[in-house]
Amino acid sequence: MVGKQKIVVLGAGRVGKVIASDLSHDFDVTSADMSPEALAFLSSRYPVKTKVTDLANRQAVAEAIEPTDLVICAVPGFMGFNTLKTIIERGKNVVDISFFAEDAFKLDDLARSKNVIAAVDCGVAPGTPDYLAGQLVHQMQIEDFEFICGGLHFHRSGPEQYLPTFSPTDVWEEYTRPARYVRDGKLIVMPPLSEPELIDLHIGGHEFTLEAFNTDGLRSLLTTMHGRIPNMREKTFRFPGHIAWIKRLQETGQPWVPEKWTPAEDQDEFTVMRISFRGSENGKPKKIDYTMFVTWDPTTGFSSMSRVTGYSCTGVARCVLDGAYARKGISPPSYIGEVPGCADKIFAHLQARNILFERHEE
C-alpha cells in the first residue's frame, strides 16, 4: 500500500496554520516553526506532526524538509527569498506565499537545474486574480485588468481606522514600496498610497464606502503579461481616513508600526476583493467582474484573510501533487492559470471551503 504524500509547511503563523490543517486531511503533514505554542495549537487539533525549527537557519530548514514530497513556504516576507532558495537547492518542489520583495525569477535557472516546480505568490492577491488572468488571456483580448483587495474590520476605531489582518511588517511593506502599474503598455512607477479614490461597494449584504490606493501587487504580472495586457493596476482597500493617518506617521517619523497594531483575528474582520477585466471577444466588447466577500469562520476560528490566502495555496499544492501542474522552474500564479483546468480546479477548491467568487459578465 502506498503511503500518503508528505508535505512540510514552513511557518505556523496565521496562514501556515490554515495550510497545515487543510492539507492534513489528505496528506502526511509536518509543520515546522520556532514557536512551540503555535505548533501545539496545530498538533492538539489536527493530525499534524510538528518540528521546532529555526527557520532563519538554512541548515535547519534543509534538515526539516529532507523527507518530503512538497514544501509550503509560509515564512514572513523578509525571510522568503532566502528560504525559497534553500528549498530549491535541496531539490524540493515548493509552493510559496511569503510575498518577498526580491524578484523570484532570479531563481528560475536554479529551479530548472534542480528539476523543481517552484510556485510563488500563491495567496489571495497576488494569487487568485493572477490565476484568472492566466486563464482569461486565452479566451478574450484583455485591454484593462484591475484588482483591489483589502482585509478590514466592520467596527473600526481611532484615527487609523484599521487593524492588520496579517503581519504588520508586511502591511508596512505595502505602504512603503513604490507601486508599479501598466498604462498603454508602459510601466508607471508611483509612490505608495498614491492616487486614492473612493469606491462604493454593495457586497455580502453590506454597503461600504472604501478608499483604494496604489500598492505594488502586480509583481510577476509585469513580466508574464507584458505585451499581452496593455493596462494593469492593483490597489488596496482601506476605510477613508487611513491613508492620511499613515502619511502623517511617515512625515513625522513616528514608529513605523504602532504598538496597538497587533494582528486581529476575531469575528469582526472580513476580506473583500474586486477583480475587473475589460476587452473583447470575437470582436465584441466584453466585461467580466469577480467579487469576493469572506468573513471570520466560526467553525475553525480562522480569519478570512488567513483562509483565502491559505486555501489558495493549498489549491495550488494539490495541483502540483496530483500532476495537474508540472512546469519546472519559477511559476508565478498566472502560469498556473494558463494551464487548462488548473484555475477551475483551484476555484472549485476555494468554493468547497466557502470562499466564493461571484462572476458578473456583460
Labelled PLM ranges:
Residues I97-V120:
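Rossmann-fold NAD(P)-binding glycine/threonine-rich loop
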Residues S31-M34:
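Conserved acidic E/D residue at the C-terminus of a beta-strand in Rossmann-like folds
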Residues K4, H138-E362:
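C-terminal catalytic/substrate-binding lobe primarily of soluble NAD(P)-dependent oxidoreductases
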Residues L70-T86, F100-A104:
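Beta-loop-alpha module in the N-terminal Rossmann-like domain of NAD(P)-dependent dehydrogenases
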Residues I7-G11:
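Conserved N-terminal Rossmann-fold NAD(P)-binding element of oxidoreductases
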Residues G16-K17:
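N-terminal Rossmann-fold NAD(P) dinucleotide-binding loop
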Residues L55-P67:
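Conserved Rossmann-fold cofactor-binding substructure of NAD(P)-dependent oxidoreductases
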Residues P36-A38, A101:
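Helix N-cap at the beta1-alpha1 junction of Rossmann-like dinucleotide-binding domains, i.e.
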